[in-house]
Every structure is written in C-alpha cells, then in structure tokens.
C-alpha cells in the first residue's frame, strides 16, 4: 500500500483528519493498534463546540449528528448557593452540541471503512 500520509491513532481526531485529507485528494491511512470494540467502546466527552460541528459537516459526517444531537446554549454555575447562568448564545453568538465523541467515532469509522483508509480495526 502506498499513501501520502500515515495518521497514527484512530480516535476522532485521527479519523477526522483522514476524512478531511481524502476530501482534498490526499491519500492517507489511519493506523490504530486497538480493536474496533475497544475504540468504539471507550467513553469520551459528550460536548462539542460549533467549530467541530462545522468540521464534521465539511468532512461529510454531520448528518446523524445534526439529527440526533442536542443544541445547548449555556451552563449554570453555582457559587455560594447562588446559581448563575452563562448563556453562550448571548455572549458569543454560538452554542455547543451534546453528541458524544464515541458517536462521532462511529460515524467516522463507517465513512473510513467505505474509503478503505482505516487499518487495524476489524470492521
């Protein structure tokens, strides 16, 4: 196998990079030493920022995320018994999205296996 880029690590970042490179016509292979069961079974963060949502859309894997995620406009912080709302939408004009990184990984693995640039996972 000949490729232009080798990406070490088949988590969400490596898979996303691989997909974005493919969309630009740059051949690559994503190498992962763990099993698919391990990679897809580990618990990861569940909040992603708008810029990541935009990257996932650009990579072609945003459809399920758009359908199943929850938009979250802010958080509440308690200090000395008083709750304070931090409204992201009002402060910066953006929200965060509740969609687990494990789900992002599932979406990216499905796409990478179609492109056949993911090595190491028994998909």
Regions found by a protein language model. Name each.
Residues 16:
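Cytochrome P450 catalytic-core helices
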Residues 112-123:
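A conserved beta-strand/loop element that lines the FAD pocket in flavoprotein oxidoreductases
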Residues 19-23, 110, 114:
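Short, well-ordered alpha-helices that flank and scaffold nucleotide-derived cofactor binding pockets
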Residues 1-13:
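Beta1/beta-strand and adjacent pyrophosphate-binding region of the FAD-binding site
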Residues 8, 20-44:
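Glycine-rich FAD pyrophosphate-binding loop
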Residues 36, 71, 114-115:
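Structured helix-beta-strand junction loops
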Residues 41-45, 49-111:
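Active-site-adjacent segment of FAD-dependent monooxygenases/related oxidoreductases
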Residues 26, 61, 117:
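Short phosphate-binding/catalytic loops that engage adenosine nucleotides
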